[in-house]
Amino acid sequence: LPVAKPVLIEQLMAGIEDSQRVEISGIVRAFRPRGVVIIFEIASGGYRRDVNVPPPAGIDPQTLIGAKVRIRGTAATFFSGKLRHLITVTLHVPRAEDFVIEKMESGDPFAERVIPLDSLAQYRSEHEIGQRVHVKGIVTYQRPGEDLFLQDATGGMQLKSHLLKAVAPGDVVEAVGFPNFEQFLPVLQDAVFRKVPESPQRPTTKTVNLSELQGGFRHADLITIQGKVLDSVERWFTLPGGGKPGRRTILTLQSSDSLFSVEGPATGTDAGRISVPI
C-alpha cells in the first residue's frame, strides 16, 4: 500500500482528499458493528467522521471509547447526484494495523470525581480536552435512545445518549460523557448513565415567564410556565436506532403576545378545545 498522507480533519471534510490514502488522528466517541467491520465514530477539530475498521484483535471496542487513535485509510467522499454537494466523508481502513491506539482513556471515568452540572461550560484547568467527565443528578425527563435531562443543586443539563434503558423522573443517576456545545449551549454528548441506589427525589421546578426562555437562560431546567392552549396535534415518532414507534402531543400555546410549542406524551384527550395552565 502507498504511504498514507497525514492530513487535517478540515482537509478531509473539504472533500479534496477523495480516494486518497490518508492519515488522521482523533478521539473515539462511539462504535457500532456492521457486518465484518466495526464503524468507529472519530471526533477531531469539531468534526465527527465514520471510520470502517476490521475488528482489532483481542480488544473490546467498548474499551476504546475516549481513546486517542491514529488511522490510515482511503477517503470516500459522497456527493449529491446533480448538484454535487458534499454529503459526507468516510474513511475505509483495510488492515487492523492501520488503526493505531496512541493513548487509552485514563482509567474508569465513573471513578473520577463528580462535577457540578453548571461547571460543564466553565474552564477547568485539570480537565484534559477530549476526555469524558462524571456527573450526577436527578432525572427530570427522558427520551430513550435520544437524550436525558438531569438536575442537581446548580442547575440542569441535557445528556445525549443512545441508551434505550428507561429511567423515571426522580431517579438519581450518574453519567459520563463528552462535554461540548450545541447551538452555543452546553451538552454532554455520547453519554452513558446508570441508576444510583438512592431513593428517588422530587425534582425542583422553577416558575418562569416566556421572556426568560427567549433569552436562553433556562436551558435544560425543569420549569413551570402558563399559557392558553390554541392547538393540539399528535405525531408519530420512531426512536433513533429503531425501537417501537409511539406518539407525542404537540401543543401550541399563547402567553402574552407570543406563541410557543410544548411537546409531551400523547394524552388521548382533545386538548385543543380547552385552556389549561402547564
What are these regions, as identified by a protein language model?
Residues L1-I278:
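OB-fold single-stranded nucleic acid-binding module
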